[in-house]
């Protein structure tokens, strides 16, 4: 299992467009990928789950990836977060 914490820096947090990008990225992998915020964990492959968290700017989130392609999955998620200027 791979687990990393991120600090959300995007002014709008994880709203519809970045949530869609994260879900699309996560959906490419067979591993279980979860996003945790304020003690609640959701499947990062679910747009409704991600949007339900209401992650705003300045928030700290944890992403866990567990499965056969976990290293590749985490690398892709990190790349998406950084490329889109969402998190540090």
UniProtKB/Swiss-Prot annotation:
| Modification sites for Phosphoserine | 46
Q: Where does it localize?
A: Cytoplasm
- GO CC field: cytoplasm
Predominant subcellular localization, coarse grouping: cytoplasm
Q: Is Amino-acid biosynthesis included in the keywords of this UniProt record?
A: no
Which InterPro entries does the protein's record reference?
HPr, HPr-like, HPr-like_sf, PTS_HPr_His_P_site, PTS_HPr_Ser_P_site
> What this chain does, per the record?
General (non sugar-specific) component of the phosphoenolpyruvate-dependent sugar phosphotransferase system (sugar PTS). This major carbohydrate active-transport system catalyzes the phosphorylation of incoming sugar substrates concomitantly with their translocation across the cell membrane. The phosphoryl group from phosphoenolpyruvate (PEP) is transferred to the phosphoryl carrier protein HPr by enzyme I. Phospho-HPr then transfers it to the PTS EIIA domain.
Q: Which UniProt keywords apply?
A: Cytoplasm, Phosphoprotein, Phosphotransferase system, Sugar transport, Transcription, Transcription regulation, Transport
Nucleotidyltransferase among the record's keywords? Answer: no
Q: How is its activity regulated?
A: Phosphorylation on Ser-46 inhibits the phosphoryl transfer from enzyme I to HPr.
Its assembly, as annotated, is:
Monomer.
Q: Active-site positions, per UniProt?
A: 15 (pros-phosphohistidine intermediate)
Family, according to the entry, reads as follows: Belongs to the HPr family.
Q: Which PANTHER family match?
A: PHOSPHOCARRIER PROTEIN HPR, PHOSPHOCARRIER PROTEIN NPR
Q: Which gene encodes it?
A: ptsH
Q: Which superkingdom, per the lineage? A: Bacteria
| Source organism of the structure | Enterococcus faecalis (strain ATCC 700802 / V583)
HPr domain residues:
1-88
Q: What is this protein called?
A: Phosphocarrier protein HPr
GO biological process per UniProt: phosphoenolpyruvate-dependent sugar phosphotransferase system
